[in-house]
UniProtKB/Swiss-Prot annotation:
Database matches in NCBIfam families: PRK05412.1
Stated family: Belongs to the YajQ family.
GO annotations of cellular component type: cytosol
CDD domains xrefs: YajQ_like
Pfam families: DUF520
Signal peptide limits: none
Protein origin, superkingdom: Bacteria
GO molecular function: nucleotide binding
Protein name as catalogued: Nucleotide-binding protein Bpet3698
Annotated function: Nucleotide-binding protein.
HAMAP family with a match to the protein in the record: YajQ
Keywords: Nucleotide-binding
Source organism: Bordetella petrii (strain ATCC BAA-461 / DSM 12804 / CCUG 43448)
Length: 160
């Protein structure tokens, strides 16, 4: 029985490369000369540090540009509110991994609503779709691409 997995993952190596490139761009930009602005990566959380909240917005644009240049979809970013104090401003940007339960249920409901002859089940942070025909699975992939989800979806482990 053919099957495939629907996942939402970000390559950690590409993420660290994008953050390094963003830090290098900060060093060369005129409006950030002499400031202590930087990006820090810990796991899948990028912390932006800058003297003011206005610069955090500019830094977020730089980060988004670098992520998209490295092939990472920016829909996976979850931006927290900036924290300001006398020493400067900080903002955490979390890179979401996996498909959360409510989103997975929404995807399953969309598949069931299309009345395709496939079975879908939630496996942790993945979604496994299986059906009798490969054509049905390809229809599911086309349907999920049209579905409005604020997460980037990848289709892996296609088995025949």
């Amino acid at each position: 029985m053919p099957s495939f997995d629907v996942v939402s993952e970000v390559d950690k190596h590409e993420l660290s490369n994008a953050v390094d490139q963003a830090n290098r761009e900060l060093a060369t930009r005129f409006d950030f000369k002499g400031t202590d602005a930087k990006f820090e990566l810990e796991g899948f959380v990028v912390t932006q540090v800058a003297p003011s909240a206005f610069q955090l917005k500019q830094m977020l644009d730089i980060l988004r540009g670098r992520l998209s240049a490295r092939g990472i979809d920016v829909r996976c970013l979850e931006v927290a509110d900036p924290l300001e104090n006398l020493g400067g401003a900080r903002q955490k940007v979390t890179v979401r991994q996996g498909i959360e339960q409510p989103v997975a249920k929404k995807l399953i409901a969309a598949i069931k609503g299309a009345k395709l002859k496939v079975e879908s089940q939630i496996n942790g942070d993945k979604l496994r779709i299986s059906g009798k025909k490969r054509d049905d699975l390809q229809e599911v992939i086309a349907l999920l691409r049209k579905t409005d989800v604020d997460l980037p979806l990848q289709y892996q482990n296609f088995r025949d």
